[in-house]
Each structure stands twice: as C-alpha cells, then as structure tokens.
Amino acid sequence: MKFKLLIIALTVLFAFNAYGEDGDVDLSFYTGTFDVIDKEGDDQTSLFGIEHKNPNLFRDTILGKFKPVTGGFITGDSSVYLYTGVEGQYGLGPLKILPSFAPGYYEKGDGKDLGSVLEFKSEIKIGLEIFENSKLSYSYSHISNNEWGDTNPGTDNQHITFSKNF
C-alpha cells in the first residue's frame, strides 16, 4: 500500500513536467537522514524524496515571495510521507533561504510511529545556485502532529537536495 501511494505521487509529479512549458516545473530530489536526533537510536534511518514546485504560481507578497510545494519521501524503514504546502524564498547574496510549511499524510510502515496520519512539516532550506536553473541545498525539517494524535514524538530530519528548473 505504501509503495503504491509513492508510485502514484511520483507519477502525478512527473505528469506536471509532461504538460508544462519550458521553465514551468521545478523538481527537487533529496536524500538524507530521518530522525537525526533519535535519543533511543532505533528509529534513525535514511530517506529519499522528490518535491515539485511550479514557478508560475510564485507570488511576491508583503511578507516575502511564496509558492506552493508538493512532495513526498520514503524512509529505509518503509515509512512514507506525502505533503503539500507553501515555501517562502528570501535572498541573502548568492544564498537562498527557503522556509516552508506543509501538512501531509504519514504512514509509519516499519518505522517510527509519529502518533497520527496527519503530520505537519516545517523546514528551513539553504540553497546555492550551482548551474543555470540548478540548485544544491541543505535542509533541516521537523515533522510532528501538534499534539493532535495519541502521541507526538516528532522527528527531525536533514537532507541534501538537488533542484532543477525544467
């Protein structure tokens, strides 16, 4: 079931690229560590994910520049997280600071029980454009259910992201 959900999510993400014009799709691929601050040491594992952003939906507001973000990841313990939310963009010289917030669906698989299927991801990403339309970033995120579930252990994750605007 978890694998089917991930395949569906990836298919939808790649479908955006098939129908978009040149420069309409920003795809990110990332890998890193799930539950990086695991006190017990039994839930830490690897993660791999994909994220989609549409530059055409980019909005410049009084609070900054924002665009929608949709993505998902799977961990080495078969946990799956699918999310959609909003990402801000702030420039600091050649660096981009990209905070984001995204509610999503979490399935624990054989991994960490986060207490609910509804989980919220807050993330801070620092990126640097390495080639034209390509960015390399470091991200740190926290996922928790805001005490809406039976338990709320939360998880902190870190990963490296490669983004390409097609």
Task: For each feature predicted by the language model, list its residue ranges.
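Outer-membrane beta-barrel "beta-signal"
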Residues: 46-50, 128, 153-166
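Membrane-embedded beta-strands that build the outer-membrane beta-barrel scaffold
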Residues: 50, 86, 97, 124-126, ...
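Cleavable N-terminal export/targeting peptides
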Residues: 1-22
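Short loop/turn motifs that connect adjacent beta-strands in outer-membrane beta-barrel proteins
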Residues: 19-24, 55-66, 91-97, 133
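Solvent-exposed loop/turn segments connecting transmembrane beta-strands
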Residues: 36-46, 72-83, 111-117, 147-155
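Residue-level signature of outer-membrane beta-barrel architecture
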Residues: 52-56, 88-90, 128, 142, ...
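Outer-membrane beta-barrel initiation region
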Residues: 21-55
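Transmembrane beta-strand segments that form the barrel wall of outer-membrane beta-barrel proteins
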Residues: 26-35, 63-75, 98-107, 139-144
